[in-house]
């Protein structure tokens, strides 16, 4: 299981076309000559939501990214048909407080939120290419994740007993709708 998850993490980290910490304006906006399309769909005091997808929407490589000055939460849909059949997507948590690693590893983390009980789970711990921060990656059932839920959530992540991520995420329903609409192109 660990080798499979590490393989998935390495593949997604190096082949995933969007790095959530990159400023949206650098991802290409609506320019068809850029590798990714990005569109801000919410700007608020707490942070900004940005949709990122391929210039021609295939329904794969869709993500919604909640970006604050300190962190990014990236909810990503399937990268290909195989992941889509299994309902797999990923949750990326990126923060300057997450240490860099020399190679991807599986790490126990404590995830607490206002909407769920505290959980101890395994996450992939990776370094972001070209970034000075690390990231934590959880494989998720993306269809369950975008179902109706509370519209805000405060998340905190501990790694090795130290808090490395905290964010009050707002406008979740809007983000879920944006991600679902983007992923629906794969079903057409």
What are these regions, as identified by a protein language model?
Residues 1-6:
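Bacterial N-terminal signal peptides that target proteins for export
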Residues 14-17:
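N-terminal signal peptide c-region/cleavage motif recognized by signal peptidases
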Residues 20-188:
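A generic "folded-domain core" signal
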């Amino acid at each position: 299981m660990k080798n499979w998850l590490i393989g998935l993490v390495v593949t997604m980290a190096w082949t995933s076309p969007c790095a959530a910490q990159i400023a949206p304006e650098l991802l290409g906006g609506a320019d068809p000559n850029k590798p990714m399309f990005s569109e801000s769909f919410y700007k608020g005091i707490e942070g900004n939501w940005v949709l990122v997808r391929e210039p021609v929407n295939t329904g794969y490589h869709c993500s919604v990214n909640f970006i604050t000055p300190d962190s990014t939460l990236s909810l990503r849909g399937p990268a290909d048909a195989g992941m889509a059949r299994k309902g797999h997507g990923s949750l990326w948590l990126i923060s300057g407080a997450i240490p860099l690693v020399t190679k991807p590893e599986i790490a126990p983390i404590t995830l607490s939120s206002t909407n769920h009980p505290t959980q101890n789970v395994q996450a992939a711990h990776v370094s972001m290419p070209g970034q000075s921060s690390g990231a934590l990656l959880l494989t998720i059932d993306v269809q369950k994740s975008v179902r109706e839920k509370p519209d805000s959530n405060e998340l905190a992540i501990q790694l090795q007993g130290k808090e490395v991520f905290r964010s009050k995420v707002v406008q979740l329903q809007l983000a879920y709708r944006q991600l679902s609409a983007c992923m629906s192109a794969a079903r057409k």
